[in-house]
Design a protein with these regions (language model features):
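Short, low-complexity N-terminal intrinsically disordered segments enriched in polar/charged residues
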Residues: 1-49
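Alpha-helix C-capping/helix-to-loop hinge sites
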Residues: 29-33, 57-58, 105
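A solvent-exposed, acidic/Ser-Thr-rich amphipathic alpha-helical stretch
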Residues: 40-94
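A beta-strand edge to alpha-helix "cap/lid" segment located at domain peripheries
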Residues: 1-14, 72-139
Length: 139
């Protein structure tokens, strides 16, 4: 497996690069949550990748969030622990990217490793309009 940064250099698909940039932004912003003044505005680099008016994220339990709700959830998550992602593979077809990562979440000193699949759907301007999240983890 390789780092998200290394994968971004190697992939050739434009939409794959955007999906990997999404993961890279996540990795850069989460550590900022420990700094004073951290808030939802920290996600501006991620918002630049999003079709804000039509964005929809469907999570593990089929919960649906628009961009403002997701930004609030991201902020709460970032404040609750640490995140690290490692690249597994990416698949791109027109308008769609499937990104597989190994994610490590650390909360209270406990590290949980999760295999994730994120399905990114893009609008005609190459902005993320829909995101589905799937996970595998130890019981």
């Amino acid at each position: 497996m390789k780092s998200i940064a290394d994968a971004r250099v190697e992939v050739t698909g434009e939409l794959s690069r955007i999906a990997l940039e999404y993961a890279a932004v996540y990795g850069r912003v989460v550590p900022l949550a420990r700094q004073p003044g951290f808030g939802e505005d920290a996600w501006a680099p991620l918002e630049a990748l999003i079709a804000v008016d039509e964005f929809e994220r469907v999570g593990l339990h089929k919960e649906v969030m628009d961009w403002p709700a997701y930004r609030t959830a991201l902020t709460a998550f970032a404040r609750s622990g640490e995140w690290e992602g490692t690249f597994r593979r990416v698949t791109e077809v027109p308008g769609l990217v499937i990104l597989e990562l190994v994610e490590r979440l650390t909360k209270g000193g406990v590290v949980t490793e999760i295999n994730t699949v994120s399905v990114f759907e893009f609008d005609v301007g190459d902005k993320i309009r829909h995101l589905d999240i799937y996970q595998q983890r130890e019981p």
